[in-house]
Amino acid sequence: MKIVLASANKGKIKEFERLLPNDEIVAFSEILGKIEIDEDKDTFKGNAIKKAQTIYDELQKINFGDVVVISDDSGISVPVLGNAPGVYSARYAGLNASDKENNEKLKAELNKLGLEKTPAFYTACIAIVYKNEVYTVHGWMYGEVLNKEIGTNGFGYDPMFIPNGYDKTLGELDEGVKKEFSHRSKALKLAMKVLEVIL
């Protein structure tokens, strides 16, 4: 089955390809070119649905045919910071901020509170649009966020996050290990069950 991913984030695309090796994953930009989608909802679910529905609607305009569009919205939440960055994780340091800039901002916020580490959790919401029906699933990963980066694997806040049950950051852990328990892989396992039912 061809699955169109409503994301231009190369890190996310690679992760979806690893988690769904038997499906043809195509980034929407390969078909539609550049489309800016304003992630203006205040929940991960709202943003995921908006992205998937927007891309699905654009594909219908060009008569792309039977297609599954999958989108995710995800981020890290730090309770001591009022669950920030939350839905603003990708733009915590500003619109078009790099991973490095976002990490620096989070470190600065933790340092203001004198925290070397504190509880945090990742949330992933996956939205699936097929035959104009919308389905959503969630996955979570709990652990601690550090005020420093360790390791170079992964993307985003991975080098700052130690998942529960581990003594290394996601930036230090092998991608195969992360695949077993990440918020996105948990959500994708549920998404696979949805796809089995609807396809």
From Swiss-Prot:
Single Gene Ontology BP annotation: nucleotide metabolic process
Gene3D superfamilies named in the record: 3.90.950.10
GO molecular function ontology, one term from the record: XTP diphosphatase activity
Active-site residues from the entry: 73 (proton acceptor)
Residues noted as binding substrate in the record, renumbered to the chain: 7-12, 74, 155-158, 178, 183-184
Signal sequence segment: none
Top-level enzyme category: hydrolase
Keywords noted in UniProt: Hydrolase, Magnesium, Metal-binding, Nucleotide metabolism, Nucleotide-binding
Record note on cofactor: Binds 1 Mg(2+) ion per subunit.
Catalytic function, reaction form: XTP + H2O = XMP + diphosphate + H(+); dITP + H2O = dIMP + diphosphate + H(+); ITP + H2O = IMP + diphosphate + H(+)
Domain of life: Bacteria
Keyword Magnesium: yes
Needed co-factor(s): Mg(2+)
InterPro entries: dITP/XTP_pyrophosphatase, ITPase-like_fam, RdgB/HAM1
SUPFAM superfamilies in UniProt: ITPase-like (SSF52972)
The protein's Enzyme Commission number: 3.6.1.66
Positions annotated to bind Mg(2+): 38, 73
Cellular component per GO, a single term: cytosol
Assigned protein family: Belongs to the HAM1 NTPase family.
Job description of the protein: Pyrophosphatase that catalyzes the hydrolysis of nucleoside triphosphates to their monophosphate derivatives, with a high preference for the non-canonical purine nucleotides XTP (xanthosine triphosphate), dITP (deoxyinosine triphosphate) and ITP. Seems to function as a house-cleaning enzyme that removes non-canonical purine nucleotides from the nucleotide pool, thus preventing their incorporation into DNA/RNA and avoiding chromosomal lesions.
Subunit structure: Homodimer.
Entry protein name: dITP/XTP pyrophosphatase
Lineage: Bacteria, Pseudomonadati, Campylobacterota, Epsilonproteobacteria, Campylobacterales
